[in-house]
Each structure stands twice: as C-alpha cells, then as structure tokens.
Amino acid sequence: MHRLSKSAVIISGVLGATSMAAVAQTTPAPTISIAPAITSAPAPGASTASVPCTGTPDPYANYNCLDAYLGDNPFTRFYRYYGLEMGQAGPPSDPNAPPSRVDGWPRTPQTTPPMPFTEWPYGGATAIGVTRSGSIDSPLMTAIANTGLGRWMNEYGFQVYGWIDPGFNFSSNSLRKPGGNAPVSYAYIPNTAQLDQVVLYLDRFPDTVQKDHIDWGLRLSAIYGENYRYTTSYGLASYQLLKYNAVNGYDFPMLYGEVYIPWVAQGLMLRAGRYISVPDIEAQLAPNNYMYTHSITYALDNYTNEGLIGTLFVTKNLSIQMGVEIGTEATFNNAWKQVGNPNPNSAALPNPLYPGSTFAKDPGAVPSYTVCARYTWNDGWDDINPCANGINGGQWGYNNLQWYGVTYYHKFNDHWHLAFEFYDEHENGVPNLKNPTVQALNTALGADGGTPFGSPFMSHNAPNEAQCKTSTPLRCNAYAIGSTMYVNYSPDPLNNFSFRPEIYYDPQGQRTGTAATYYEFSIGWQHWFSPQIEIRPEVGYYHSNGANAFNGGTKNWTLIGAGDVIWHF
C-alpha cells in the first residue's frame, strides 16, 4: 500500500552475500557442489591453491575443505557457516564453478556486501545474462546440503531462504500512536522498536547465462511484520490493514513464475503473477535497500502489480519491457467487480460522486500497461531506465497511480556511486475535500463517505481524497512529483555510507494527507559483520513547506534516528 494512515496521514531478496534486489535480481555466481552458489565476490585473499584439509580446515584457502570444516550434522553446519563467513566480504569461492555471466556482458558494477545489489536494479525479471540457478548464499541451504532434501533441491535449482529484520526509531514526534511519524515510512510509530519483517522465499532461478535451452523459474514469498502495510494489495489478505489496522500482518508480495528464452535477441524473460512494480531504486524487502527507512518518494508510489511482463535484451546494453496488469495494488478478483452502493444519491443525502445503486469495488482494478526501456553504457558503470507503470484511465482507485519516471545510476570508481530517481504520478477525478457536498458525505458517513472506499468497505487506511484549488469542483486531478538520490561512499567491502536528499511535491495532499512540499536530508551507515548479518543506523531531517505535516499536523519538521539489523538464513 502506498499510503500511510489517514489519521496522520515491501520476493527478490537479498540473502547473505546475494542481496538480490527485489526490483532487479543480482548476479548469482555458479552453483557449487554441496551448497548454493553465491552472488557476491569471494572474500579478498581467497585462494584456490591445494592446501591440505588438516587441523582446522580453511575453505577460503582450499574450497575442497568446506565439507570437512562444516561437518555432517545440519545444525552444526548451520552455525559453523555463520562462523566461517564472519568478517569476510563473501563466501568461499569454488574454482571449478562455471562462468557466472555471459561473455562480453557489461561489467558488474557493485558487490554485495556492502551494496544491496550487484547489478543496477531494473525489476520485472530475473537478471538476464548474469544468473545461475541455485545461486543464493544461504546458511540454511548450506546446512541441509548433504541431506536427501538438500541434494534434491540443489540438483533442480530450488532454494529456501530468508531473513529476520527488527528495527527501532527515536523521533522528535511526540504523537506516539500508529502513523505518528507519517509521512515518513518504515518507522511507522514514533519512539518504538518493531518487527519490521520476517521473510521466507522459495526460489528457482532460470539459468540466464546458458544459451542452449529454454529454462524456467518461480518465486513464492511470504512476509510477516509491520511492513505488510506497505505491500498490501486490495483483495489479498487486505482485511488486516483496511478493517483492523493491525500493527503486524502477513502478505505475499511476490508469487510468480518465469520462462526464459535465450534465442530471442540476447534473451527474453516472461514473468506472470504478482511481482514488484518497476523500476525504483528502493524496494519493499529490507536487504534490497541502502538504508533502513525509505524516501517519501518511494513510500508513496507503486509497489506491486498482478499480470504479465516481458523483458527483452535487444543487445547486451539495451533492453525493453512491456507488461499488462490489473492496476496497481489491485487484484484480479476485484477486476470489473460491482458491489452495492449503500449510499446512492438521495434527497436526504445527495451523492453525486457515485449516484447509482452499484459501483466498482475498486475502480482501479482494470487492464493497465507498463512500458520501460533500459540502456547501460560505459561498460556497465552508467545505467538509465525510463518507465511508465500501471497506466490506464487513471480513475481514482485504491492506489491507481499513473507512474511516469526514470532511474539513473553512475559509478565514479570503486568507492563512489550515485543512484537518482525522478517521477510524476497522478490519479484523475479524486473527490474534492473542499467541496461542501463531499464534506457533507464525510461528515455523515465518515472518511471517503459515499465512495467504494468508505464504510462499510474500509474502516482504516482508505485512499486519501484531494485538496483541490477551490471548493467549486466536485472532483479534481491529483498529482505528485518525487525526486530522490543516494550518494554512496564505500571505504571497504564491509561498509557503505549513504546520503539521501529528497524533494517531494504533493500540491493536493492526496498522497501524504497534507498539501505541502517536503524536503529530506538523511545519512545512513551500512555495516556488514559478514555476508549474512548487517546493521543500518541512520538519522534524517524532514521539513514540510506550506503546511504543518508532522506530529499529527502540529509541526513542519521532524528529526528521526533509526536503525535495524538484518539477519539472513
């Protein structure tokens, strides 16, 4: 869901060294013999020399000693693998692994650690030209690798893995209730600790390096925690958010299958199901992000789509995407569905917004399209990705945003890079909060009264109405412009510092609940103890120009310190 609560107004995932962006899976390395392969670079100093497996075996000196080091018991292997990788920038490297990317493909711009991805994110497809099946560095998969189940999963490229992500924040906001930090996201309640997300994936990646056969893949994901409120689609377990406003809940942000056809140009990927909206720098799943909190720009745009999207690499540098879906944060079970209008137009309570006896349950659950192009140059160090996502008639819906934007990445050297995003998004025909008729409906029936999103359909977190220029029109078009950037400095393979400036313009207040221009300046540190354990402390200053948007509308600024721990398994 791309709103915070009206009262105050995130599976690609990284695991361990992979950190595959939900919006663009990273570059997995080839599969190894007893455990899943890894996507991150091997730790510095790793050797392929033949060192005897005597005494305390060192898999970093001799990969063949990995089994001897880990032992046979799955529980022993599990905790020893954490110990093995502690202080390392990657797992042991198999010298006999097949190539992990297509010959002549642009350079891999980043490594994980310390970044949340290795390839510049584009989403909508398992990364073409750089992905091998079974390529996640997972302590759980390593633990069960020598069992019957583990051998079967490894043989066929299946993996089960995930992470646990608790977090906290200290805020200058004194309104300590759900939504008290709004419109700041992913730190929903001021001055508290929370379980952000527990995530479990079942994956099979199609092999996009090979060129000799059609391959297939899938992802089944589940999330539990506070962050469910940002991924919720209307019609899929949405009662937790829209009826009860539960602090913690569950969701299934990615449920899709893929088919990879290597012979079409440089590779064609077809994905069908529920998937993360394209393109975006940030993503719902914690390991796919530089920082713990998210920009307002990201928090209030598209999150997921249900449909079919195709990604075609025309050349190794140029790719195009086209997709058809049912709106944004919309589900097929709501498409074209009509429900009874409990408050049709009447003399006692005029309702010109929805005068008929029925209306669409979600007017935004209609056929929509996505079109994107991506170009990479400078041998992989520059990348631009313009997109139009979730495009239809733009009628006011649960989250029927018409998104037009672009992402851009540039690597200066091995220590510095930046990521930039800009977009315009809008919805049409949003009820005007300044109009007397709309005000009368809201007074008599509650928020969004007389619409598909008022009582009895939604008790909490319904989409905002608009603060139009004047009180005359019944409806108006609401738009927002967002722009954010991450400037990143990595002094070594286990640390990265991110500076995030942002401007978000919400003139009708439909996205945030308060019509204002928002400015943000945040800085964060990402420190990896190993490819499996990461901490992300940060501090951010937010300011609203034109209205008091923070602390329940009493202040025009807020200062928030926050952080989390991501523990992969």
Where are these regions (language model features)?
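Loop-centered beta-sheet repeat module
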Residues: I320-Q402
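Short, conserved clusters of charged catalytic residues that mark active-site
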Residues: A143-A145, F252, N305, G482, ...
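Outer membrane beta-barrel
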Residues: P59, R151-S172, R176-G180, S185-A330, ...
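Outer-membrane beta-barrel pore domains
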Residues: T27-T39, S50-Y82, P92-P99, W105-P106, ...
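Glycine-rich, flexible loop segments associated with nucleotide phosphate handling
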Residues: I214-R219, K243-G249, Q266-A272, F359-V366, ...
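Residue-level preference for beta-strand/loop junctions
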Residues: Y156, Q194, G249-D251, N302, ...
